[in-house]
Amino acid sequence: MADKKGSNSEKLLYCSFCGKSQHEVKKLIAGPSVFICDECIDLCNEIIRDEAAGAGIEAGLSKSDLPSPQEIREILDQYVIGQERAKKILAVAVYNHYKRLKHLDKKDEIELSKSNILLIGPTGSGKTLLAQTLARLLNVPFVIADATTLTEAGYVGEDVENIIQKLLQNCNYEVDKAQRGIVYIDEIDKISRKSDNPSITRDVSGEGVQQALLKLVEGTMASVPPQGGRKHPNQDFIQVDTTNILFICGGAFDGLEKVIVDRTEKTGIGFGASVKSKQDRDAGEVLREVEPEDLIKFGLIPELIGRLPVVATLGKLDEVALMKILVEPKNALVKQYHKLFNMERVELEIRPAALQAVARKAIRRKTGARGLRSILEQALLDVMYDLPQMKGVSKVIIDDNVIDGDGKPLLIYEDAPKVAGSN
């Protein structure tokens, strides 16, 4: 029944799907003899989105209009500011990878190898965001793994096959989808071996993990326990072929510039050699000259470097880039805070001087773009705490004094004269 009589003979309308009355929901939409509430509509939309996303993984990889490198780059531009060369390298590498997957079934004498990617750049330069954006664009399963938590199988900690288990969880244990996903391994530089000579002692979280990752990255049948289970000998495992999973490894590689400079300066000796002091060279400029031998000297094993043929370096973000990151991307932080304040029916204005102060603070902290949110959150904490209880506030203005901790936000009230707070 879509309608019932109330105790006071008022005709109450009910949702035909969940049975809630018109007083229990925000909106009740009528059809021929049926009603549906806003909550059921939201639930239906969620179900449709989930099913479309699942179907889209196969569709996205089999249809002829796979995004071109230029289109991939344009979408990356909407979310990631700067790092132009890295975006170009990634766009080409990802396009070639999924183009290769589309032609796997075709018989051909030439077998195309997989090109995994290594991202090198300082903290907060956009490595993780680039990988996340690519996965969202291609609509494929995606997982982020932290290399510092990994240990060799048999030791306390996560073994490398846990990465594949997380990937399976992200696509509801559908093996075919997982086998075409993207894995981002962060902090890969933290598992470098302690010296560039092969170790004779057991290094369970360094060279040992690199050896374990090597098999996964180049392609192997990973044995993963069933949904929600833990590994034990007397159980059936899910077999996942990692051959077509795209692995993107990222790390800050602190100290790699010194290794590169030491190598390049050795070759720049004698008359006519270009002499440039270490201080004159930007770290990003130095990193662009990275060679496999530098990564080996840093502590990565040669076999793993060979499985990461595409190397993209990201530079340190300057003040201008950080200010752009605050306002320009689709999901920019300032846009997010505008939306939060709009929910309270209050306009938020963050002045250019305040944006500059946020950027400078992030540079001083050496946190890059990753530190921007915590700086803004700290500056806006008090006003976000008080605002729901305050009456008549129409606008909040943030200037550089608020960011630096020397002042409080300027509040404009609805009944205040127009000149209040202006200048």
Curated annotation (Swiss-Prot):
ClpX-type ZB domain: which residues?
3-56
Q: Does the keyword Kinase apply?
A: no
* Taxonomic superkingdom: Bacteria
Specify which residues bind Zn(2+) according to the UniProt entry for this protein. C15, C18, C37, C40
Q: Where does ATP bind?
A: P122, T123, G124, S125, G126, K127, T128, L129
- UniProt-listed CDD domains: RecA-like_ClpX
Choose any GO biological process term that the UniProt entry carries and state it.
proteolysis involved in protein catabolic process
- Enumerate the UniProt keywords alphabetically: ATP-binding, Chaperone, Metal-binding, Nucleotide-binding, Zinc
* A Pfam family hit: zf-C4_ClpX
> Keyword Protein biosynthesis on this protein?
no
**What's any one GO cellular component for it?**
HslUV protease complex
Q: Name one GO molecular function term.
A: zinc ion binding
The intrachain disulfides are none
Q: What does this protein do?
A: ATP-dependent specificity component of the Clp protease. It directs the protease to specific substrates. Can perform chaperone functions in the absence of ClpP.
Per the similarity annotation, which family is this? Belongs to the ClpX chaperone family.
| PANTHER family recorded | ATP-DEPENDENT CLP PROTEASE ATP-BINDING SUBUNIT CLPX-LIKE, MITOCHONDRIAL, ATP-DEPENDENT CLP PROTEASE ATP-BINDING SUBUNIT CLPX-LIKE, MITOCHONDRIAL-RELATED
Assembly mode: Component of the ClpX-ClpP complex. Forms a hexameric ring that, in the presence of ATP, binds to fourteen ClpP subunits assembled into a disk-like structure with a central cavity, resembling the structure of eukaryotic proteasomes.
Name of this chain's protein: ATP-dependent Clp protease ATP-binding subunit ClpX
> What gene, per UniProt, encodes this protein?
clpX
